[in-house]
Amino acid sequence: MVGIVGYGAYVPSYRIKVEEIAKVWGDDPVALSRGLVVNEKSVPSADEDTATIAVTAARYALARAQIDPQKIGAIYVGSESHPYAVKPSATIVAEAINATPDLTAADLEFACKAGTAGIQMTMGLVDSDMIEYGLAIGADTSQGAPGDALEYTASAGGAAYIIGKDNTLADIEETYSFTTDTPDFYRREGQDYPSHGGRFTGEPAYFKHVLSAAKGLFEKTDSKPEDYDYACFHQPNGKFYLRAGKKLGFTSEQIKQGLLTPNIGNTYSGAVPLALSNILDVAEPGDKIFVVSYGSGAGSDGFTLTVNEEIKEKRDLAPKTQDIIDRKQYVDYAVYAKFKGKIKM
């Protein structure tokens, strides 16, 4: 069965608190933190971008997989903040991990679910025996306009997954997707910051797609919430994540391990891959995991996984997600604005 052979995560070490951003714009930090369920977010340094995040996560995934990178037949990097408009991030990753030249590679974009789309694509290639291993990465250095609500959550980070058939640490048993044309969030070529539909991004966008994908996956697998040990969903903020879990019938115990947004913000394409990596860091053999991503535009990908014995041998071969998150240094708004290129000369 196709499954995860190795995984790796990376989150930049810099952080900015919600109260620091609120101080600049005269907003109420207590109300914002309570409403969004976000306390602080990650900030990429001046020398960090989607490609560097993807490379680091990929190297950690290789460390856990313990395979020859030359056996990787496909690399897909999902992001909405690729450093180049014309120049793939995937080839940078491929060269950095010594996987070139005998492979296919491409950059993917579907708002915040491009990473899980890459997982589905590698699953198909591996399952059909077209390749032995595939590498799928979800990573972003997301942007929010100064003073916009997104500025309190848009952050940076990502995770990588090596997909294969042998020595899997978790089997991916089923996948299901739900997709419509819903323009809740978008950015045209040349624009520095995205536009969004405000409250419209909730019920007809995020919740409609996440809940529909989850229900479709329940039906496809003939399963229910209590059949799973862990569950995680896309998390533009903590509030949406917790509400989605409750609506679907999951308990707080099932979903708490995957909730990372309060301490790192919304890593966009990295959100669900990072949540899953944090679950794999603690899951035991036999545990079942339920995962649903979301990308504006709009669509959701769902997965069910079962953890295998190999997790015990592999998870300590690379830094754990929470350890990476705990390594942090706070910056003020001036440094944050400089790192994020918000100051235009």
Curated annotation (Swiss-Prot):
One Gene Ontology term of the molecular function aspect: acetyl-CoA C-acetyltransferase activity
Alphabetical GO biological process terms: farnesyl diphosphate biosynthetic process, mevalonate pathway; isopentenyl diphosphate biosynthetic process, mevalonate pathway
E.C. numbers: 2.3.3.10
Protein residues bound to CoA: R199, K239
Pathway per the UniProt entry: Metabolic intermediate biosynthesis; (R)-mevalonate biosynthesis; (R)-mevalonate from acetyl-CoA: step 2/3
Record field: catalytic activity: acetoacetyl-CoA + acetyl-CoA + H2O = (3S)-3-hydroxy-3-methylglutaryl-CoA + CoA + H(+)
Pfam (any one): ACP_syn_III_C
UniProt signal peptide: none
Entry keywords, A to Z: Acyltransferase, Isoprene biosynthesis, Transferase
Active site (catalytic residues): E80 (proton donor/acceptor), C112 (acyl-thioester intermediate), H234 (proton donor/acceptor)
Segments traversing the membrane: none
Residues where (3S)-3-hydroxy-3-methylglutaryl-CoA binds: D28, C112, T153, T201, H234, R243, N266, S296
Matching InterPro entries: ACP_syn_III_C, HMG_CoA_synth_N, HMG_CoA_Synthase, Thiolase-like
Annotated family: Belongs to the thiolase-like superfamily. Archaeal HMG-CoA synthase family.
NCBIfam families documented for this protein: HMG_CoA_syn_Arc, PRK04262.1
Assembly behavior: Interacts with acetoacetyl-CoA thiolase that catalyzes the precedent step in the pathway and with a DUF35 protein. The acetoacetyl-CoA thiolase/HMG-CoA synthase complex channels the intermediate via a fused CoA-binding site, which allows for efficient coupling of the endergonic thiolase reaction with the exergonic HMGCS reaction.
Name the UniProt record assigns to this protein: Hydroxymethylglutaryl-CoA synthase
